[in-house]
Amino acid sequence: MNETDHKHITVLLHEAVDGLAIKPNGIYIDGTFGRGGHSRLILSRLATNGRLIAIDRDPCAIAEANTISDARFQIIHTAFSAIPEVCESLGLMGKIDGILLDLGVSSPQLDDAERGFSFMRDGPLDMRMDTTKGLSAAEWLAQVSIEDLAWVLKTFGEERFAKRIAQAVVSYNKTNSEKITRTLQLAKIIADAVPFKDKHKHPATRSFQAIRIFINRELDELEKALTNALRVLAPEGRLSIISFHSLEDRMVKQFMKKNSKGEVVPKGLPILEAELNKNIPLNIIGKAIMPSEAEIVANARSRSAVLRIAAKR
């Protein structure tokens, strides 16, 4: 595979970092280092006493981060759901001026056939973001029931043919001595099971997304990170979160809305609305931001990105 296959264009780079409203001497967390696009821009805006803690669970991302030689920067190999534990260990609970999360799978992960994320490239069916932990997709599919697989495809992929696909996958693994172990092998089984093809979308798109989300517990990770964000952030600390599919974006949107919504004071009550709502934890900053047409032309994978920004009060 040549180097251009692994070229990574950071999505909503300036918009996401602008959303952090960087204080030159602030302390920031990039919870999804990836290939370092956001981290490098954050560092360029920090003064000598600023600090950036980057987190990623992908060993390849850790290797990339280790090429950055900067006293203001440190990389930690863990999932972003562990941000509270990281802050506790560093004595930074409630002192973080901003957290950036760029959710989902990165272009290098998709383009590296050996990682098993892509239904367009043949490779081992792995799909783990952290290849040192947990079951691979192939190992899980070898033991899953039709009911459980159908639930995963429906819940995390919103796949209308979930039951058909689950039956085809489980049946193949039960009737063949050689199990499903390759990405293109799984993609073909899924395509053959789907009765109606969408000419704009590969029939395996939703299933691969669903299996990846399940294997990596992506929504659980996001829920934990959101739940603990308010404990971690300093007053006026920013949350800048990019999501790439409706399940993630819905969670982020609902979290921000729930924590920024005040109560309406019934007429006649001797209490001011401002007094009642002084403990609202978040302010939503602006509207959701989508990539420009120019960015989508330059990087088609940015098309589904949504950036939401909020600030702790």
Curated annotation (Swiss-Prot):
It comes from the Bacteria. S-adenosyl-L-methionine binds at G36, G37, H38, D56, F80, D102, Q109. One of its GO terms (molecular function) is rRNA (cytosine-N4-)-methyltransferase activity. Its EC number is 2.1.1.199. Gene3D superfamilies: Putative methyltransferase TM0872, insert domain (1.10.150.170), Vaccinia Virus protein VP39 (3.40.50.150). It catalyses: cytidine(1402) in 16S rRNA + S-adenosyl-L-methionine = N(4)-methylcytidine(1402) in 16S rRNA + S-adenosyl-L-homocysteine + H(+). Pfam families: Methyltransf_5. One of its GO terms (cellular component) is cytoplasm. It is an enzyme of class 2 (transferase). Keywords: Cytoplasm, Methyltransferase, rRNA processing, S-adenosyl-L-methionine, Transferase. Coiled coil: none annotated. GO terms for biological process: rRNA base methylation. It is found in: Cytoplasm. Its main location: cytoplasm. Specifically methylates the N4 position of cytidine in position 1402 (C1402) of 16S rRNA. Belongs to the methyltransferase superfamily. RsmH family. This is Ribosomal RNA small subunit methyltransferase H. It comes from Haemophilus ducreyi (strain 35000HP / ATCC 700724).
